[in-house]
Amino acid sequence: TPVSAVGSTDMHAQTQQHQDGKKDKVIQFVEILEREQQIVLNNSFTHISSLKKYDGLSVDHALKIALAANEEALNSDGRLNAKYILPRIDEYYLGQLLYFLMLSVAYEGELADVDAYDQPGVETYKQIMKQKMSHQ
């Protein structure tokens, strides 16, 4: 079941399950090599010496370090993971990634003997919903 996570906040919320839970998932990362805008951290807490090292650090660099650390932790425990590297976010590269992921869902459906296109398993809920909505 796909679950999305963006950045280190979402990643942190799910890392415990990924690292110590069942080994029944493939964790997928998307790394963007070139970004149009760079956000730079400004240290508002100059009186805290341990935070001085983060002044001037780009958010992009921090996210790449978080991705690499998470990837290394997963690998150290034999957890399946994949990293998709896009040169930049644009229609061409995003389209390629989405096409690849759509094909992988179709392929996985075939391997698991699940109809990924017709989705007959959804029909029961749709029929119940239709009946309930007609009684409103």
Stretches found by the model and what they are:
Residues 1-136:
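A SIS-like phosphosugar-recognition module
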